[in-house]
């Protein structure tokens, strides 16, 4: 199958873009949330966490849950050398992942399923498998995908690629369902994070290709991909033409997810290629998965005022 499904990285349990979390808001607490103070920092479960003063050794508290700074430091030190440098700049991301892990373990325990002899990772995986094992893809859905992505299957007939297409779509469907489920984690609980620590993490986390472009004041198109991925390689000439056509009007950014695994995880990249379009304020307006034909790209750019 030419379209490559590429899992970016598992730091603690999974790397999935999250959105939504605690219902705590600044109006209730009189203190800002992470999402209000640092809009681009949190990718999900901590967006609505309240920033409060804490002991330097404590990073997060919430109804029986406490995460210490030492836990994040240990995770960085134990990381693969290939991602350790990137993790040093993304400790807040690790805190989010540790929070997701803890909340998922709570959910799994409350389900009453037998966990004897299982590792934490196995408990989480079994819990998610039980919840989303019945997801299927119809022939009609597979055909619609095939019709929209004929360029990536090398001219093969639908019947020749139907089953691989259905496997990829089912995997993506499960990932989407998991993401929706994760949106509800922590929704009914108060989550508090260390104000000073989060402030210190903001600058290093924003020091990357994507966030710098989003803060430039110009519209931005980001391509998340990798070399050797057929649809990714097909996108490169399009990106080159865009750079030449709009040198002053548009940021065109390519992120190699193999070399920027944490950045890809932060931006919820589960399959490649992915094209994400941001307006001049850095707000995401649209994203697309798979090869994206140049006429369609130009339509999205026109919506951003780039013509």
Regions found by a protein language model. Give the residues of each.
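Solvent-exposed, amphipathic alpha-helical "stalk/arm" or coiled-coil-like segments used as scaffolds
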Residues: 57, 87-143, 151-192
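Short, low-structural-confidence N-terminal segments
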Residues: 1-89, 148, 191, 207, ...
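Thiol-based oxidoreductase modules, predominantly thioredoxin-like and allied folds used
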Residues: 224, 243, 248-261
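Short pre-active-site segment immediately N-terminal to redox-active cysteine/selenocysteine motifs
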Residues: 217-220, 224-228, 271
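A C-terminal, polar beta->alpha supersecondary segment
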Residues: 26-51, 152-216
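Non-catalytic, surface beta->alpha helical segment in thiol-disulfide oxidoreductase systems
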Residues: 279-307
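Structural micro-motif
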Residues: 268-276
